[in-house]
Structures are given as structure tokens and as C-alpha cells.
UniProtKB/Swiss-Prot annotation:
Organism: Orientia tsutsugamushi (strain Ikeda) (Rickettsia tsutsugamushi)
Family: Belongs to the methyltransferase superfamily. RsmH family.
E.C. no: 2.1.1.199
Main EC class the enzyme belongs to: transferase
Protein name: Ribosomal RNA small subunit methyltransferase H
Record field: catalytic activity: cytidine(1402) in 16S rRNA + S-adenosyl-L-methionine = N(4)-methylcytidine(1402) in 16S rRNA + S-adenosyl-L-homocysteine + H(+)
The organism's taxonomic lineage, starting at the top: Bacteria, Pseudomonadati, Pseudomonadota, Alphaproteobacteria, Rickettsiales
């Protein structure tokens, strides 16, 4: 298990989660096991982990051996957690590390990255609708809508038009084929100078989010999380782009205790609190240090939000 990577914002995650002996924590996005290992190594606690990617089952099996009676794994999307955990004792903490994992990006045959020429797949669960099916079957309007909505790509209409024109000549089946169509549509050098990213990046993000239904899964799970957490349990979420963070921020703020405004003439020196379930531990997002970004460039867009459940 020495090859397990150190996940982003590891120190910050542990600081906000503050795991202790004899408590139980949920790792919603097991991946290569980075967060689970940090938590289990920190104290004599238990971890329940979820991940829909069958490629991580072999890693999870190593945890069963190293942490007997302390680790449980479900090869399921975290949105299914309530189905498996609702009859168990409530959790003392939940951690989520969202988006595509480094392991998935680095496996060329998964089709998440245009750094390799591979089948255009992008399925986290390796089941269901492939990215290649979407780009070859969706209408130009559907393509533009998804690319704009989930990629926040201002040139979505132009990209969609080029995809439709290209697939009439030849089906789009590989990552580099799609990336080059996008680059041809919007240019490469000028786009990079303006945005500091490859011109295919936002479109690949959009298609991946759509194929895996990522944003609705996040929203659905966050709604479950308040039922799963015990009072004094902590919710830690790491996201990598504005669409994810907006959902998390809105959820936490909607469920947070709020100070009630009062007259400046009031003799009450303590601001009373409105009813709420969560206390925000991060008033602003936590972000990686310069050192972490240098050591792991993929961490540069990571942002962490944390909250404490204080009421049922």
C-alpha cells in the first residue's frame, strides 16, 4: 500500500475532520484510498468508503487486510449511501473529494484525458452511456447546451457545430480526435493565451460531468448527509471547479446557523442565532499552499469547505 498517493489538502482535511478513537467516518470518494488511509492511520477509528469505479476494488481489498474490522467498502456511487447506512449508527464525519481522480486521469484507456489517444469513454462506473455515444448521437443544440452548462465554455455553439460537421465525415471515437476538433473550432494558441488552459479542457469537463451525472449526485448526497451525520459530526468537501463549489456553498449556507440582526441600542451583547443545523468551520474556502501546488499541480484548483452539525 506504499503506492497510495497523498490526496489534495490532506493536512487541512484532517484538521477539520479531527478524527478520534472509536468513531466512524464516511469516505464518499475512496479512489486510490488517500483520505481513508490518512483517517485510519490517525487514530483507532472506523472508515466506511464508497466508490463506483470497479478499478479501485483491488485497492480496497488491501485495506481490509491492513485494517481488519475497521474498514468497509461499497462499490457504489456515494449517492446510494443512505440505502446502505440508514440503519447503522450515525456518522461522526463525512469527507468528499470530488471530480475525476488522478488514477482515472492517468489510465489512458479510461478516456478521461486528451493527453493520450484512447477510446472516448469517461465512465466512472464503467457502465452505461459512453462519451463517444453522446458526441456522436446528441443534437447540435444538446451538445452546445451541455458544453456551456457544465463546462462554462463561451464558445460552446462553435464547438458543437464543429463536432456535428466532423462526425458526418467520420465517427468520433477517441480522445485526441475530439480534442483536435475542439482546437480546430476555437483555435489553440489564442485560447491558451487568454484562458491559460487547453481549448479542449472545458468541453472534456462538461462531457464528463454529464456522462456521470456528477452535479445532481452531489446535491442529492448533501441532502442525505444531514440525516447520516450525528450531532457534532463534521462534513468536509473538496471540489475542483466553480459548479461543484457553488452547490456546496449554497447547501452549507442554507443550513447554517445565522446571527440575527439587532438594534445598535440593544443591551444584549451576544447576537442571538437563528435556527440552523450546521456551523460553518470555513468562513472562506481553504486552498492549497504554494508548496502543495508546486508538488502537485493538479491541486491548484482545489477548494475545501467544512461544517459542523450542531442540531438535529
Amino acid at each position: 500500500m506504499n503506492n497510495i498517493h497523498t490526496p489534495v489538502l490532506a493536512t487541512e482535511m484532517l484538521s477539520y475532520l479531527a478524527p478520534v478513537d472509536n468513531e466512524t467516518y464516511l469516505d464518499c470518494t475512496f479512489g486510490a484510498g488517500g483520505y481513508s488511509k490518512l483517517i485510519l492511520s490517525n487514530c483507532n477509528c472506523k472508515v466506511i468508503a464508497f466508490d463506483r469505479d470497479p478499478a479501485v476494488i483491488s485497492i480496497a481489498s488491501q485495506f481490509y487486510q491492513q485494517y481488519p474490522n475497521r474498514f468497509t467498502f461499497f462499490n457504489e456511487n456515494f449517492v446510494e449511501a443512505n440505502k446502505y447506512l440508514s440503519k447503522l449508527d450515525k456518522l461522526n464525519g463525512i469527507v468528499m473529494d470530488l471530480g475525476v481522480s488522478s488514477m482515472q486521469l492517468d489510465e489512458a484507456n479510461r478516456g478521461f484525458s486528451f493527453r493520450y489517444d484512447a477510446e472516448l469513454d469517461m465512465r466512472m462506473s464503467q457502465k452505461g452511456y459512453k462519451a463517444s455515444e453522446f458526441v456522436n448521437e446528441a443534437s447540435e443544440h444538446q451538445l452546445a447546451d451541455i458544453i456551456y452548462k457544465f463546462g462554462e465554455e463561451n464558445k460552446a455553439n462553435k464547438i458543437a457545430k464543429h463536432i456535428v460537421l466532423a462526425r458526418k465525415k467520420k465517427p468520433i471515437t477517441t480522445t485526441l480526435q475530439l480534442a483536435n476538433i475542439i482546437r480546430e473550432a476555437v483555435g489553440y494558441n489564442n485560447y491558451y493565451k487568454k484562458n491559460k488552459i487547453d481549448s479542449a479542457t472545458k468541453t472534456f469537463q462538461a462531457i464528463r460531468i454529464f456522462i456521470n451525472d456528477e452535479l445532481s449526485a452531489i446535491q442529492n448526497f448533501l441532502n442525505q448527509s444531514l440525516e447520516l451525520l450525528a450531532v457534532n459530526g463534521r462534513l468536509i468537501v473538496v471540489s475542483f471547479h466553480a459548479l461543484e463549489d457553488a452547490i456546496i456553498k449554497k447547501f452549507m449556507h442554507q443550513n447554517a446557523v445565522k446571527k440575527v440582526a439587532q438594534s445598535k441600542y440593544s443591551t444584549n451583547r451576544q447576537s442571538p442565532l437563528q435556527n440552523g443545523v450546521l456551523y460553518l468551520l470555513t468562513k472562506k474556502i481553504a486552498v492549497p499552499t504554494r508548496t502543495e501546488i508546486i508538488n502537485n499541480p493538479r491541486s491548484r484548483s482545489a477548494r475545501l469547505r467544512a461544517a459542523l452539525k450542531i442540531n438535529e
